[in-house]
Amino acid sequence: MTCPNSSCVFEDKMCQGNKTAPANDAQLTPLVVVLSTISLVTVGLNLLVLYAVRSERKLHTVGNLYIVSLSVADLIVGVVVMPMNILYLLMSRWSLGRPLCLFWLSMDYVASTASIFSVFILCIDRYRSVQQPLKYLRYRTKTRASITILAAWFLSFLWIIPILGWRHFQPKTPEPREDKCETDFYNVTWFKVMTAIINFYLPTLLMLWFYAKIYKAVRQHCQHRELINGSFPSFSDMKMKPENLQVGAKKPGKESPWEVLKRKPKDTGGGPVLKPPSQEPKEVTSPGVFSQEKEEKDGELGKFYCFPLDTVQAQPEAEGSGRGYATINQSQNQLEMGEQGLSMPGAKEALEDQILGDSQSFSRTDSDTPAEPAPAKGKSRSESSTGLEYIKFTWKRLRSHSRQYVSGLHMNRERKAAKQLGFIMAAFIICWIPYFIFFMVIAFCESCCNQHVHMFTIWLGYINSTLNPLIYPLCNENFKKTFKKILHIRS
């Protein structure tokens, strides 16, 4: 029996320097049962992942497209590669013909390479999301992600060229044995080493570098958020009560902007009244903040609603003071999240904290310094304009800081995604590094190969396709809830 095929650069004849006696049926039966169970579990779990993403709307995100690509590659390993490996193990020789052998080799190389590249592009996606959250948010669409995934699979399918057409490039290549399933380049050391570097070592080193950057950025962001959260009172303490909106100490003879806005108008009859709009909540989409429609569809950012201000009235001060402010009835003002809300955990609290934070940082307007007396004619227009300008200024500050909070909310989501990526990369490296180290050793020393060790490293790499579907619900609450829903498991 020769060593069966494995991932992108595995060859049958690698262990020809150290042959062992074929195992008998009594020894093979338990092994076949275990390996068959692994194959069935791999197929079942990856089908569950694909069905979960298809059926659950919350999982229709750009990031999960890379998960789907990885699951498809793992599914091919479980459906085609593992069973044929077990069959080859039972037969001790290849008796299914050369065409089926080439099909098996092609599927093995393509699926294993696609799995590696899927983890790689997933890492790049997480890296860009963390390093440039708002800029990449506009660029990060399902179309672009799909193109990237197709490019990764296209590169993976390039393995078919040397597998099927090696003899067209190297006519003097010896004919393979009919009882072996091996590629025509099984003994070409330079080609195997080159492909191992391109397919595994280089992507792995880049992924480790990317993840180090991701970890550093997320850690700095968390430290920054702790400083911000420690600077302002929590939303639960404030309760959005009118009396709690009086922030900051009041200097003698001066009023804070919030107190000015809360002051009831005096009945002077001079200023025009802006009639309040209807009290029905209106859906708000800010072009620079929450108007990314594609992200709403992806489930990353939801909708929010604002109840309009009840009353806005131009209010003059005492006669001759020349100062006017907008008076807003705060008793009915509310900010209510929609049914869908922000899909990210803690998004609502984060947004509310930012609003309260901004309320403390509003700069004083012309309430601190008396303005020049306005002419009697057109005085009410001037006073009304002053109030509206202050409201406009307040809105601009809220919107500007909202941009920063969108970045913060996005980073919170990416922190959890980085955790998921960390587990995926750890499983990937632990499962595949033994095989590729062993491969590099025997590429230069065929007599150093041990068949049983080599067989173990092959299946350890295969088991990576079994572990990946277990990582998704472990690190993603939406996956966990969807899996429980599909399997009818009560929380």
From Swiss-Prot:
<feature type="topological domain" description="Extracellular">
    <location>
        <begin position="445"/>
        <end position="450"/>
    </location>
</feature>
<feature type="modified residue" description="Phosphoserine">
    <location>
        <position position="384"/>
    </location>
</feature>
<feature type="binding site">
    <location>
        <position position="435"/>
    </location>
    <ligand>
        <name>histamine</name>
    </ligand>
</feature>
<feature type="modified residue" description="Phosphothreonine">
    <location>
        <position position="143"/>
    </location>
</feature>
<feature type="modified residue" description="Phosphoserine">
    <location>
        <position position="402"/>
    </location>
</feature>
<feature type="transmembrane region" description="Helical; Name=1">
    <location>
        <begin position="31"/>
        <end position="51"/>
    </location>
</feature>
<protein>
    <recommendedName>
        <fullName>Histamine H1 receptor</fullName>
    </recommendedName>
</protein>
<feature type="modified residue" description="Phosphothreonine">
    <location>
        <position position="141"/>
    </location>
</feature>
<feature type="binding site">
    <location>
        <position position="108"/>
    </location>
    <ligand>
        <name>histamine</name>
    </ligand>
</feature>
<dbReference type="GO" id="GO:0071420">
    <property type="term" value="P:cellular response to histamine"/>
</dbReference>
<feature type="topological domain" description="Cytoplasmic">
    <location>
        <begin position="213"/>
        <end position="420"/>
    </location>
</feature>
<dbReference type="InterPro" id="IPR000276">
    <property type="entry name" value="GPCR_Rhodpsn"/>
</dbReference>
<feature type="topological domain" description="Cytoplasmic">
    <location>
        <begin position="474"/>
        <end position="491"/>
    </location>
</feature>
<comment type="function">
    <text>G-protein-coupled receptor for histamine, a biogenic amine that functions as an immune modulator and a neurotransmitter. Through the H1 receptor, histamine mediates the contraction of smooth muscles and increases capillary permeability due to contraction of terminal venules. Also mediates neurotransmission in the central nervous system and thereby regulates circadian rhythms, emotional and locomotor activities as well as cognitive functions.</text>
</comment>
<keyword id="KW-0597">Phosphoprotein</keyword>
<dbReference type="GO" id="GO:0004969">
    <property type="term" value="F:histamine receptor activity"/>
</dbReference>
<feature type="topological domain" description="Cytoplasmic">
    <location>
        <begin position="125"/>
        <end position="145"/>
    </location>
</feature>
<dbReference type="GO" id="GO:0007268">
    <property type="term" value="P:chemical synaptic transmission"/>
</dbReference>
<feature type="disulfide bond">
    <location>
        <begin position="101"/>
        <end position="181"/>
    </location>
</feature>
<dbReference type="InterPro" id="IPR017452">
    <property type="entry name" value="GPCR_Rhodpsn_7TM"/>
</dbReference>
<comment type="similarity">
    <text>Belongs to the G-protein coupled receptor 1 family.</text>
</comment>
<keyword id="KW-1133">Transmembrane helix</keyword>
<keyword id="KW-0675">Receptor</keyword>
<feature type="topological domain" description="Extracellular">
    <location>
        <begin position="166"/>
        <end position="189"/>
    </location>
</feature>
<feature type="glycosylation site" description="N-linked (GlcNAc...) asparagine">
    <location>
        <position position="5"/>
    </location>
</feature>
<feature type="binding site">
    <location>
        <position position="199"/>
    </location>
    <ligand>
        <name>histamine</name>
    </ligand>
</feature>
<feature type="modified residue" description="Phosphoserine">
    <location>
        <position position="231"/>
    </location>
</feature>
<feature type="region of interest" description="Important for agonist binding">
    <location>
        <begin position="428"/>
        <end position="432"/>
    </location>
</feature>
<feature type="disulfide bond">
    <location>
        <begin position="445"/>
        <end position="448"/>
    </location>
</feature>
<feature type="binding site">
    <location>
        <position position="113"/>
    </location>
    <ligand>
        <name>histamine</name>
    </ligand>
</feature>
<feature type="transmembrane region" description="Helical; Name=7">
    <location>
        <begin position="451"/>
        <end position="473"/>
    </location>
</feature>
<feature type="transmembrane region" description="Helical; Name=6">
    <location>
        <begin position="421"/>
        <end position="444"/>
    </location>
</feature>
<feature type="glycosylation site" description="N-linked (GlcNAc...) asparagine">
    <location>
        <position position="18"/>
    </location>
</feature>
<feature type="compositionally biased region" description="Basic and acidic residues">
    <location>
        <begin position="252"/>
        <end position="262"/>
    </location>
</feature>
<dbReference type="GO" id="GO:0007186">
    <property type="term" value="P:G protein-coupled receptor signaling pathway"/>
</dbReference>
<dbReference type="GO" id="GO:0045907">
    <property type="term" value="P:positive regulation of vasoconstriction"/>
</dbReference>
<dbReference type="GO" id="GO:0005886">
    <property type="term" value="C:plasma membrane"/>
</dbReference>
<feature type="topological domain" description="Extracellular">
    <location>
        <begin position="91"/>
        <end position="98"/>
    </location>
</feature>
<feature type="transmembrane region" description="Helical; Name=5">
    <location>
        <begin position="190"/>
        <end position="212"/>
    </location>
</feature>
<dbReference type="GO" id="GO:0043114">
    <property type="term" value="P:regulation of vascular permeability"/>
</dbReference>
<keyword id="KW-1003">Cell membrane</keyword>
<feature type="topological domain" description="Extracellular">
    <location>
        <begin position="1"/>
        <end position="30"/>
    </location>
</feature>
